[in-house]
Amino acid sequence: MIRLALKFALLATFCMGVCGVIEADEGMWVFDNLPLKHLKDKYGFEPAQAWIDQLRGSAVRFNNGGSGSFVSTDGLVMTNHHVGADTLQKLSTKEKDYYKVGFVANTKAEELKAPDLELNVLVDIRDVTAEVLASVPKDATDAAANAAKRAKMAEIEKAATTANKMRNDVVTLYQGGRYALYTYKKYTDVRLVFAPEFDIAFFGGDPDNFEYPRFCLDVCFFRIYENGQPAKPRHHLNWNTQGTKEGDLTFVAGHPGRTSRLFTVDHLKYLRDTSLPFLLDLLKDREAFLLEYAKTGEEKARQSKEDLFSYQNSLKARMGGYTGLKSPEFMASKEAAEAAFRKTIESDASMKEAYGDAWSKIAAAEIVAAKSLVKYNFIERGLGFESTLFSLAKTLVRHSAEVRKPNSDRLREFRDSALESLKMDLFSDAPIYPEYEVAKLTHSLQYWQSKVGANDEILKKALAGKSPADRAKELVAGTKIADVATRKKIAELAPEEIAKLDDSMIAIALAIDSAARAVRVDREDYVEAIETANYSRIAQANFRIKGESVYPDATFTLRLAFGTVKGYQELDGRNIPPYTTIGGTFAREQAHEAQEPYAIPKSWHDAKIAGRLKLQIPFNFISTNDIIGGNSGSPVVDKDNKVVGLIFDGNIHSLILDYGYDDKLARAVSVDSRAIIEALRSVYNAGFLADELTTSK
């Protein structure tokens, strides 16, 4: 944390959210507004439309939160082991723990069907800004305007879905400055092909997470099927078996989740002073609980391992961003950039009238957000009910009510265009472990009680006069919705029929639903609506001053980032070279006496002893590509659109990238394409898979 705090004195070149001229290799660019002139001016590279189309068409979105790419003509998709971890966990049993020991399908018949995995491939982007904004009545309040826009977005999505039978999402860009309809081809027959052991996919564990040097084979392969046969994608990426060298230009096509680079200073202060401290406390609590739970038995550790990784990863990432926001130098640079932008607006009477008070209105909204933060998170977001069974019950209760409303009046997750994906999750046959459910629910109820006190009215309703432990046992024991067939039957019931069910989880979901809906409405009307309206005004001001050469904040939609393979100098003076090697992994294991999480799997030692493993081959490398969470699994390609790497992490200095860009110290971390092929051939006896990657044209 000290290194993060010290580094912000160096951030004078950060993008402060209103930049117009591209600095360095900054930007997560939408594919219909790429920085082609900058690429040509700086690198002498001007991608042809065919190059853009191939990369866009090869990129895959994992709907559980990650990226991937087609890498063969037979529907083979590459991503990270940690993106595939959810599926690996769901496919695993006490007898076969694929998450731990890995998996290789030697034939297509051996590939394992993922229980509830949806992959999306972008096929079209259409600007619908005019349609969305035209739906807002004159003199509408911010809340009414937001409702009108949501209704229009639902209408656009439904019309598109009816016409093209694909997935259609209206995406809000520039915090409300632009709206675009993203159309995706959706795949739901997805099968596991290959995953390495956890101990090499995540070598170094949490201590090395967001650090560099790294030594990880964080890769996983799936295959998409259509009509029972391997899919034949229109586009895929070929493989560069020679890899990169320092200074090479690289590109990343992926789906960064969320950034806050366009946020106002007051909004960032809300994150720093209220939202992030709340979240960090929760993450620390959940991590401590899961660490203790894992100690109570090997099977319990297996069942909870992926959850533990997720919480630890989130905790480290959010702590890094929080440390950045706590830096006086960083916040001073944000304040200076905002002041300069506002001064430009104030100097023009028409712009002052149109946009001048947007910042103060956002500041007022954050005060409201702070007041509702605890209630909103515990009852609407469900942090007080950490339970898969409760989440399913809540979805069933709301599904019954929402689908009987006009499409435009529904909660967004229940609109017609989203229902197919929602039902895939709702009717997943992934295992649910009752004992783990009781433990999670007990702990989350206890944590909720510790934050609001035993006299909180909604908590009292949830506990029904019992202790958290007794109530959790009662709720898990008294529900039948762990059974998929039961969930399907309940999903057909009307609200009045659901209210008559004798099911504990359904009953508790019903009991708190009105309170949860109320706090959600307050959040949408008095926080999000005001933010959207006024960020839209700020975006319009920025467009008037600088045009549309500014990239929008990340929205888990397809973006292009570019950068070069480049080392850096640490704050303590150490020079960090861009590459690590396979041999370096064994040296790091020896330095840590092969203690977890620095124990290399036996398969790798066997390959080394047999002389098959080429230790000098580059394993991981770093580059200046602008990436964040959600980019995990993104392909790294060269100027020929060939795979040279696979994004899996950022270094510790990249954790501020949610709020601004830096290329002095921040780096993206990738698995080298050469290491992937070497591991497949020399460690896993999967030369057939290496051949598919390197010979597919």
What spans do the regions from the language model cover?
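Terminal presequence/propeptide segments associated with secretion/organelle targeting
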Residues: 2, 9, 19-697
